[in-house]
Amino acid sequence: CRTYNIDGSEIKVINDIFDNLIEEMGMISQFEIPPLPKLAFDSDDVVAYDTVVCNKMADVIEKENRKMRDTTFIIAVFDSLFTCYYLDLNIANIEKQLPERSYIDALNAMKDSSIISYQLNLSQIKSNKRVTLRYYSEFPKGFKIWERENYNFLFSGTLKMSRIYFDKEKRVGLIYCSYACGRLCGEEVIICIRKISDKWSIEKTILLGVS
């Protein structure tokens, strides 16, 4: 059974940082078209280009991006906040990148076998971004999840989050997150969070891997 009781503090943390987490990991912005490259000038600082064509291209890009900004994306979230105990994390490397020593307690907690996974209730997670969360288990298994042509919605990707590991005073914490936007596209990070005036915010993102 994957259902374990928690005191609700971890859900509060997720709600406090979730919109920023979406931005940090590019779960929406990856779908926007990058702007036109800067024009390259010759040695005489003269360049020849068709302003009409360039302006039309810029207008098309902006129009498509506005459309994306009004679109709701679906994110497949793994059903459980999992324990980091069984992950092969390079703890020494993570420690070197921590914002400050106050995170050491939280880092040590990631090796605590008594902190176990628990099933996530997505209805408790709120977001002001244009996303809808669905359980990963509701999607096709394996690589079939990436067959976007079979969906009648815009599929952003998959998100996996760990339990939240706090220091003893619950002033700072660490979360392992991985986001995949395709078969060979994604990243895994450690999110460093800090509590300021009863609200949690992301202080630093430590990149563990990218593909």
Place the predicted regions along the sequence by residue:
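Short aromatic loop motif centered on NTY/YTY
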Residues: 159-162, 178, 206-211
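Flexible low-complexity loop/turn motifs enriched in small/helix-breaking residues
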Residues: 1-172, 180-181
